[in-house]
Amino acid sequence: MTRGEMKYEGKAKRVYATEQAGEYIVEYKDDATAFNGVKKAQIMGKGEINNAITAHLYPLLEAAGIPTHFLEKLSDREQRVRAVTIVPVEIIVRNVAAGSFSKRLGIEEGTPLPRPVVEYCYKSDALGDPLINTDTAVALGWATEADLARIRELSLQVRDFLVPYFEARGVRLVDFKLEFGKLSSGEIVLADEISPDTCRFWDAQTNEKMDKDRFRRDLGGVEDAYAEMLRRVTQSV
């Protein structure tokens, strides 16, 4: 399979057309951004690690009955995916208070939530990915009520799979962001990635951060944290 025209370039990935109708190649970059692109840097090897983690987890999610766009890992930085139209509504699933949630609501970071909290954001770097509700998404034509119900259902299924998976590997899944897309058939599938870029991972014993917060908060050790997460994700237990 060969890369054709670049269809899209985001903060962390490039998407290319292929000779196969309905399939794209996704290339993972080492570019790191925070605060909706305000802070920028390079994290050496990040693209390879995020590609490897996503390529490991998505087939497991598929086996658990969660449809995804993932088809196969092509190289250290590339994977083959099904072409989707991205729904411009990002989903954040929170298990523990952290980040903007703690600041916005005055809840101490690290406070366990008695049930998962699902938040919706409009996917727009220019606007800072603002929080929205489902009424807004429907009124502005970003998604239908049925789309959003299915997206919520799938998001919680992802959560129910990932929480015990990471617990077994000594990792606390604090929160995570998901993106979904529509196939040409109209089916909604999980797209994008699951990685230290899109999740808050804390060590279960020490609460040490093993994700992009190390970059956001200038904690250092970013490359080592990403490498450790790859080791744990692929660890057999």
UniProtKB/Swiss-Prot annotation:
EC id: 6.3.2.6
For this protein, what is any one GO molecular function term? ATP binding
Q: What's the top EC group for this one?
A: ligase
Catalysed transformations (reactions): 5-amino-1-(5-phospho-D-ribosyl)imidazole-4-carboxylate + L-aspartate + ATP = (2S)-2-[5-amino-1-(5-phospho-beta-D-ribosyl)imidazole-4-carboxamido]succinate + ADP + phosphate + 2 H(+)
Gene Ontology process terms (BP): 'de novo' IMP biosynthetic process; cobalamin biosynthetic process
Where are the disulfide bridges?
Answer: none
Which SUPFAM superfamilies does its entry note? SAICAR synthase-like
Q: Which UniProt keywords apply?
A: ATP-binding, Ligase, Nucleotide-binding, Purine biosynthesis
| Pathway in which the depicted protein is active | Purine metabolism; IMP biosynthesis via de novo pathway; 5-amino-1-(5-phospho-D-ribosyl)imidazole-4-carboxamide from 5-amino-1-(5-phospho-D-ribosyl)imidazole-4-carboxylate: step 1/2
PROSITE patterns given in the database record: SAICAR_SYNTHETASE_1, SAICAR_SYNTHETASE_2
Q: Which InterPro entries match?
A: SAICAR_synt/ADE2_N, SAICAR_synt_PurC, SAICAR_synth, SAICAR_synthetase, SAICAR_synthetase_CS
Give the UniProt family note. Belongs to the SAICAR synthetase family.
Checking PANTHER family in the record gives: MULTIFUNCTIONAL PROTEIN ADE2, SI:DKEY-6E2.2
Q: What is this protein called?
A: Phosphoribosylaminoimidazole-succinocarboxamide synthase
Gene source species: Deinococcus deserti (strain DSM 17065 / CIP 109153 / LMG 22923 / VCD115)
Traced from the root, the source organism's taxonomic lineage reads:
Bacteria, Thermotogati, Deinococcota, Deinococci, Deinococcales
Which gene name does the record give?
purC
